[in-house]
């Protein structure tokens, strides 16, 4: 990537070998910049036309003159030229940005449930980016609460389809419902962007094979699980606090039917075994991504297994916060006689990492995901091809970088 200078502007020249993630961010920034530039060009053009008109009015022409004066002719021509130039500039920029006429397009969004900590941050950023940066009208961006009920969410999607929304962005209650939902959207001719909860690989391949306008935007949950395991390996004892040659752990899952929960559960432990560490699973139980449920699970586990528990893995930070409450109530201290890891990098969890109350978490970058999902929706509206999967990387969060992540969240 090179920076060139042309007139008063700096121009980034993106080379062919520039990483895709960087290209996407440049395109995203470019869209916003272009639209702002269009406004300036339009305003400047209209101002020039007005100035010329005023000059002509002061040139001595009379109301009784049948034919326009030369000054008036020049004014009219200049005004028309300026208006046409502004119009062409606006159209060109809008097409380049892929955001032509989005203000009148309707985006239907369904979130699996509103009281999920992480998805609250995600939907707030998604709504902000669609309306403030991409130019959708606020009333045309409708976000509904799936209430953790797939039947309820499917009904919402049917309503979006009936009302002829232009594109849907869906955080499914159950990722296994993706084939059914995809077919509903396909039959209605409405493109769909799935977020956060990934359909299985076979479904994503079907989109490619059948040329279906569907995509998944999100992180690879295997990466988040691996990072959790690595955070335990990076501790002084590599998780084996009592020195018995193995890591004894409790696993608090989100929803066992959810792909993210499955991968985080599997790959957090796999990171340990791949490193040659022996493990012992004391308990694995469903916490439904819920803080209160996780607190009860951790409390029961601590009562049953006591000091034998060396690590508590949680599929998300909300459950890690609940587990911490149980740990502290039991008189245990994180990073001294027990380790605790989560996923999402909720503000409170990151602060706990800084304070030594949580061993680590994994930043589920809702900023980048929300922008990538919205950009994909705009491309679909514009008739562009969109990859079946748009990946966004997780970021490991430990005491070494937790303050940096917290500053970003604020």
Please give the residue ranges for each predicted region.
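Short, Lys/Arg-enriched N-terminal segments with co-localized hydrophobic residues
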Residues: 2-34
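Bacterial lipoprotein signal-peptidase II cleavage site
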Residues: 40, 54-66
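Hydrophobic alpha-helical segments within soluble ligand-binding/sensing domains
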Residues: 97, 101-102, 107, 153, ...
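Extracytoplasmic "Venus flytrap"
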Residues: 106-133, 141-159, 163-165, 171-176, ...
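Short, solvent-exposed amphipathic alpha-helices that sit
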Residues: 118-133, 224-228, 259-278, 297, ...
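Hydrophobic alpha-helical
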Residues: 126, 158, 162, 167-187, ...
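Flexible loop/hinge segments that line or gate small-molecule binding clefts
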Residues: 181-223, 244-245, 346-354, 359
């Amino acid at each position: 990537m090179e920076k060139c200078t042309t007139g008063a502007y700096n121009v980034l020249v993106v080379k062919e070998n520039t990483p895709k993630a960087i290209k996407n961010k440049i395109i995203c920034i470019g869209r916003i910049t272009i639209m702002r530039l269009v406004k300036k060009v339009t305003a400047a053009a209209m101002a020039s036309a007005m100035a010329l008109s005023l000059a002509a009015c002061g040139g001595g022409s009379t109301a009784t003159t049948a034919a326009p004066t030369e000054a008036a002719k020049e004014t009219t021509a200049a005004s028309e030229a300026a208006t046409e130039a502004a119009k062409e500039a606006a159209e060109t920029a809008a097409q380049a940005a892929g955001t032509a006429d989005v203000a009148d397009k309707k985006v239907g969004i369904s979130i699996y449930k509103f009281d999920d900590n992480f998805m609250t941050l995600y939907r707030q950023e998604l709504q902000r980016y669609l309306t403030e940066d991409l130019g959708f009208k606020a009333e045309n961006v409708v976000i509904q609460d799936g209430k953790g009920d797939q039947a309820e969410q499917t009904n919402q999607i049917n309503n979006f389809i009936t009302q002829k929304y232009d594109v849907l962005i869906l955080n499914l209650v159950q990722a296994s419902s993706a084939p059914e939902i995809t077919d509903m959207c396909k039959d209605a001719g409405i493109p769909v962007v799935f977020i956060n909860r990934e359909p299985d690989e076979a479904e994503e391949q079907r989109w490619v094979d059948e040329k279906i306008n569907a995509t998944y935007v999100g992180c690879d949950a295997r990466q988040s699980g691996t990072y959790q395991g690595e955070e335990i390996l990076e501790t002084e004892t590599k998780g084996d606090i009592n020195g018995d040659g193995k890591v004894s752990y409790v696993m608090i899952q989100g929803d066992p039917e959810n792909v993210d929960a499955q991968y985080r559960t599997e790959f957090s432990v796999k990171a340990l075994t791949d490193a040659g560490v022996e493990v012992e699973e004391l308990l694995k139980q469903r916490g439904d991504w819920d803080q209160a449920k996780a607190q009860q699970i951790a409390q029961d586990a601590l009562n049953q297994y006591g000091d034998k528990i060396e690590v508590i893995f949680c599929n998300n930070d909300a459950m890690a916060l609940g587990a911490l409450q149980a740990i502290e109530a039991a008189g245990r201290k994180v990073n001294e006689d027990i380790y605790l890891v989560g996923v999402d990098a909720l503000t409170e969890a990151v602060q706990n990492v800084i304070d030594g109350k949580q061993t680590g978490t994994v930043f589920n970058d809702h900023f980048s995901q929300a922008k990538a999902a919205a950009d994909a929706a705009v491309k679909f509206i514009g008739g562009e091809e969109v990859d079946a999967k748009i990946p966004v990387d997780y970021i490991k969060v430990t005491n070494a970088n937790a303050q940096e992540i917290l500053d970003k969240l604020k």
